[in-house]
Amino acid sequence: MNTKAMLETLNEITLLVDEPLKNVTFTKTGGPADVLALPKTKKEVEEIVAYCREQGLSWLVLGNASNLIVRDGGIRDVVIMLTEMKEIKVAGTTMIVDAGAKLIDTTYEALAADLTGFEFACGIPGSVGGAVYMNAGAYGGEIKDVFQSAEVLLADGTIQTMTKEDLNFRYRHSEIQELHCIVLQATFALEKGNHAEIKAQMDELTELRELKQPLEYPSCGSVFKRPVGHFTGKLIQDAGLQGLKWGGAQISEKHAGFIVNIDHATATDYVELIAHIQEVIKEKFDVELQTEVRIIGEEV
């Protein structure tokens, strides 16, 4: 990749060369991206994708890098991170939100407008684009419950509006995962509610999260999808794995469904510990755990 030419051509866009992705991931692990692009507008995203297409460069998108592990060898693609695109607009009972906006911020803007429906997401640390990508959910709610449409940039450079039907949401999945495209903005349909009741529910869910989840350590959030008929955390507990340390990573003593970075863990520590958990759970209970966390990048 000719990074000098890219910097010269896209000189108005923030481009970081050989940027360690441990600086942006919630696990505080991960190798460097050859180029990390931080667009501030839809137009800048279009320009980056157009340049990559013209030069034959591959690209990928990161949301808030919360439910993500980047391997220690890093990423050779152009990495596009949308955290600078974070406008949140409210129009009646509709919210129009840039993909890089934090989901937590979005829920509190809904509260400020006395809008109900987003309470379930008040503690989910991801971005709005990432939440649409994986149909994020918690405490009985999912993004699909409030989703109306998304503005998406396709790989060929065209922008398309996709509906709930188009995205075919299911558990921790949307059609965005099958398409090489970028969520630029999402529209959500909420309802008018009582401010005090909305706040009380959000406070209750926040308290639950703080009580049950290891928020005091870096982590990638929930590591595994919930297998049918089981609770992942209980399987890991019953297997005697809770508290297991692997390098600088550890299965949380607070919630066995989380792996925390307790001592300068590497992405390799995380990936190997995940594989070990999967192997043990398969052997003991004949249950195959599938990762919810997205694992990308190259080995060292």
Swiss-Prot record:
This is UDP-N-acetylenolpyruvoylglucosamine reductase. The keyword Oxidoreductase applies. Its EC number is 1.3.1.98. PROSITE patterns: FAD_PCMH (PS51387). Belongs to the MurB family. It comes from Enterococcus faecalis (strain ATCC 700802 / V583). GO terms for cellular component: cytosol. It comes from the Bacteria. Cell wall formation. Its cofactor is FAD. GO terms for biological process: cell division; cell wall organization; peptidoglycan biosynthetic process; regulation of cell shape. Residues 28-193 form the FAD-binding PCMH-type domain. It is found in: Cytoplasm. The keyword Ligase does not apply. Keywords: Cell cycle, Cell division, Cell shape, Cell wall biogenesis/degradation, Cytoplasm, FAD, Flavoprotein, NADP, Oxidoreductase, Peptidoglycan synthesis. The active site is at R172, S222, E292. GO terms for molecular function: FAD binding; UDP-N-acetylmuramate dehydrogenase activity. It catalyses: UDP-N-acetyl-alpha-D-muramate + NADP(+) = UDP-N-acetyl-3-O-(1-carboxyvinyl)-alpha-D-glucosamine + NADPH + H(+).
